């Protein structure tokens, strides 16, 4: 593997520079004096930001983008061996690193690199940890998998030994990372186009946890199935967190978690508050500016780590009040004719369930969910779970499956989910065309309704288009 000397800036080219992680890494290198160029299939706000920094951008991937003055090429997992730039790199014998290996080498430059992992909640928790450390004057470098308004983007360049990295398990990419501290939020079946089964996923997370050094800290949710096995044979310090449903349960299980939430309440807009306990003793009342019990757990994970690393409770509380959410995480887009339009990235049944349960505490008449399934593999693997989760909405509109990296196998469609929802008495519609979905919603949504566009594809454009009408 090619090893980078970060004291000697070179020319690095990124294939797929518009990706949320790749763009941040490109900006980080540019800030450190490296010559950076990159290509992407299409233009975007992220690409335009890089262009304005002075980074050379190519729209469209072509062999001529690969020149002999390039010293290293970094590429995403989505880039295949038949990619024209990939082939040109091999022809020129230029060293290559995939994004995960490259990021792993970057993390080695920071004594306190932090990896935030889990099937769900990574972006939110990474953002919460980041704001806590910013408020606590840790001056961290931050790489988050979404747009965080508080740092005006997805990357923040600090000048300390602290580096916060969202760490995804897909294709075992986080096993190339080198964290000193880590969070494991949850472990569920996901990315079954790569992992064999849930046991394969559990093994991957255990391997990730074993990468932590003796002086490191692993924060792990105590509600993970068989979490005791997850923390076996670890040399690092292990910190657990969880939520109690009542004071009686907490009193009977004081030693279950190192950090715990109890007496969770919500205001008229669904924003959560709770009592924080540390080692069984009351610490403070925590107020969040986001909705949902899943965000109580996300905030607990962030608190557990930052408090352990020396953050003050005043800074932690102030940061949580400042966190209004990340782009595409229950993001309030606007109001049209009294209809509140929200967008959410949820694309796994557990995420859909958490979002719709949280939405129920938000002021509304009917909850409309416009769902775009993401990948054929995921839709087939969790078909019945999708039906159960989506049934929590009052009315459901299903768009076509967003293929992403996959070919259509021809044996699964959004129409199949609609049929299952109709069987259980739900009001569900399948509409393939986005323009027709918009027309349908304008005709059927009424004043006081909550409209949620949901999915990891381009379904967000429906709400944005409606608000322009």
UniProtKB/Swiss-Prot annotation:
ATP binds at residues 118-124. Keywords: ATP-binding, Cell cycle, Cell division, Cell shape, Cell wall biogenesis/degradation, Cytoplasm, Ligase, Nucleotide-binding, Peptidoglycan synthesis. Gene3D superfamilies: Mur ligase, C-terminal domain (3.90.190.20), Mur-like, catalytic domain (3.40.1190.10), NAD(P)-binding Rossmann-like Domain (3.40.50.720). Disulfide bonds: none annotated. SUPFAM superfamilies: MurCD N-terminal domain (SSF51984), MurD-like peptide ligases, catalytic domain (SSF53623), MurD-like peptide ligases, peptide-binding domain (SSF53244). It catalyses: UDP-N-acetyl-alpha-D-muramate + L-alanine + ATP = UDP-N-acetyl-alpha-D-muramoyl-L-alanine + ADP + phosphate + H(+). Pathway: Cell wall biogenesis; peptidoglycan biosynthesis. It comes from the Bacteria. Its EC number is 6.3.2.8. It is found in: Cytoplasm. GO terms for cellular component: cytoplasm. The keyword 4Fe-4S does not apply. InterPro entries: Mur-like_cat_sf, Mur_ligase_C, Mur_ligase_C_dom_sf, Mur_ligase_cen, Mur_ligase_N, MurCDEF_pg_biosynth, UDP-N-AcMur_Ala_ligase_MurC. GO terms for biological process: cell division; cell wall organization; peptidoglycan biosynthetic process; regulation of cell shape. GO terms for molecular function: ATP binding; UDP-N-acetylmuramate-L-alanine ligase activity. Belongs to the MurCDEF family. Cell wall formation. This is UDP-N-acetylmuramate--L-alanine ligase. It comes from Lachnoclostridium phytofermentans (strain ATCC 700394 / DSM 18823 / ISDg). The gene is murC.
């Amino acid at each position: 593997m090619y090893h980078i000397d970060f004291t000697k800036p070179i020319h690095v080219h990124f294939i797929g520079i518009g990706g949320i992680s790749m763009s941040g890494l490109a900006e980080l290198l540019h800030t450190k004096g490296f010559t950076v160029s990159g290509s992407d299939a299409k233009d975007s706000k992220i690409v335009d930001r890089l262009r304005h920094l002075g980074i050379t951008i190519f729209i469209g991937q072509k062999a001529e983008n690969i020149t002999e003055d390039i010293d290293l090429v970094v590429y995403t997992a989505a880039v295949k061996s038949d990619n024209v730039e990939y082939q040109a790199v091999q022809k020129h014998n230029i060293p290559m690193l995939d994004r995960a290996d490259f990021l792993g080498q970057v993390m080695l430059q920071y004594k306190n690199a932090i990896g935030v992992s889990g099937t769900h909640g990574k972006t939110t928790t990474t953002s919460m940890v980041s704001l806590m450390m910013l408020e606590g004057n840790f001056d961290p470098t931050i790489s988050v998998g979404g747009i965080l308004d508080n740092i005006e983007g997805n990357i923040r360049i600090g000048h300390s030994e602290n580096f916060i990295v969202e760490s995804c398990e897909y294709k075992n990419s986080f096993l190339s990372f080198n964290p000193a501290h880590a969070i494991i939020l949850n472990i569920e079946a996901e990315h079954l186009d790569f992992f064999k089964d849930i046991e394969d996923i559990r093994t991957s997370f255990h391997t990730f946890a074993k990468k932590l050094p003796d002086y490191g800290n692993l924060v792990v949710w105590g509600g993970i199935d068989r979490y005791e096995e997850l923390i076996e044979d670890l040399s690092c310090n292990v910190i657990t967190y969880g939520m109690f449903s009542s004071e009686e349960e907490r009193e009977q299980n004081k030693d279950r978690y190192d950090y715990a939430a109890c007496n969770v309440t919500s205001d008229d807009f669904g924003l959560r508050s709770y009592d924080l306990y540390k080692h069984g003793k009351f610490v403070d009342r925590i107020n969040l500016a986001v909705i949902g019990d899943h965000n109580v757990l996300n905030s607990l994970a962030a608190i557990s780590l930052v408090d352990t690393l020396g953050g003050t409770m005043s800074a932690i509380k102030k940061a949580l009040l400042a966190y209004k959410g990340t782009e595409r995480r229950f993001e309030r887009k606007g109001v049209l004719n009294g209809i509140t339009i929200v967008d959410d990235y949820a694309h796994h049944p557990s995420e859909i369930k958490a979002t719709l349960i949280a939405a129920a505490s938000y002021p509304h008449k009917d909850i409309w969910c416009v769902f775009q399934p993401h990948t054929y593999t995921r839709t087939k693997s969790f078909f019945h779970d999708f039906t159960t989760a989506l049934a929590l909405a009052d009315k459901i509109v299903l768009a076509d499956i967003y293929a992403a990296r996959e070919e259509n196998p021809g044996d699964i469609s959004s129409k199949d989910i609609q049929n299952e929802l109709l069987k259980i008495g739900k009001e569900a519609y399948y509409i393939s065309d986005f323009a027709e979905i918009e027309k349908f919603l304008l005709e059927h949504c009424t004043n006081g309704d909550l409209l949620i566009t949901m999915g990891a594809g381009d379904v967000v454009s429906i709400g944005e288009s409606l608000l322009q009408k």
